[in-house]
Amino acid sequence: MKHILIVVDIQKDFVDGALGTAEAVAIVDNAAKKIREFDGDIFVTYDTHFENYMESAEGSKLPVPHCIKGTDGWTLNETVAQALADKKYTAVEKITFGSVELPKLIKEAVGDEDFDITLIGLCTDICVVSNALILKANFPEKEVYVDAACCAGVTVETHNAALATMKMCQINIEGE
């Protein structure tokens, strides 16, 4: 069986930059450990915006420029980048919360093999839940896991609400 790890948006702007939180900083070491110990295929998503972010639909609802491609805030958190340094992984740039490209890339990677998927990253209540639900919709017979110890939300309350939502959608929550 193949194992797939999705590292969702552990970028500088979400850890300790424009939209960073103490909770995000607190999960970095757990995420790096998970990456270092993982044996399988790794996909790393990058929230990717451009100079016109404030003119976008997202920018009108979240008026905080972040993850602008080419800026320091768009890059991976240094600890996570170091954990990935010796790993082969597929980078996936996405312009919105969930990646519609990710299921296609996973299908290509697994071929006919059985597989499961684990997600870690930021923010639990926006991009992690969006990608988890997209993956569960595309692979309804596969086990999808989220390691809560490697995730943080915008707030503790919304992190917990996202975990509850994912549980209701038959996504397995570990590390609570």
Where do the model's predicted regions map?
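Active-site acidic carboxylates
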Residues: 1-90, 112, 145, 154, ...
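Short phosphate-binding/catalytic loops that engage adenosine nucleotides
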Residues: 140-142, 171
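Histidine-anchored nucleotide/phosphate-binding helix
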Residues: 30-37, 129-139
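A short glycine-rich beta-strand->turn/loop micro-motif centered on a GG-aromatic cluster
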Residues: 118-125, 142-156, 176
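Short amphipathic alpha-helical segments
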Residues: 126-130, 134, 146, 161
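Short, well-ordered secondary-structure micro-motifs
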Residues: 54-56, 102-104, 130-131, 157-158
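Internal catalytic-core helix/loop-beta-alpha segment
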Residues: 70-126
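Active-site-proximal beta-strand/loop segments in catalytic clefts of secreted hydrolases
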Residues: 45-48, 95, 122, 149
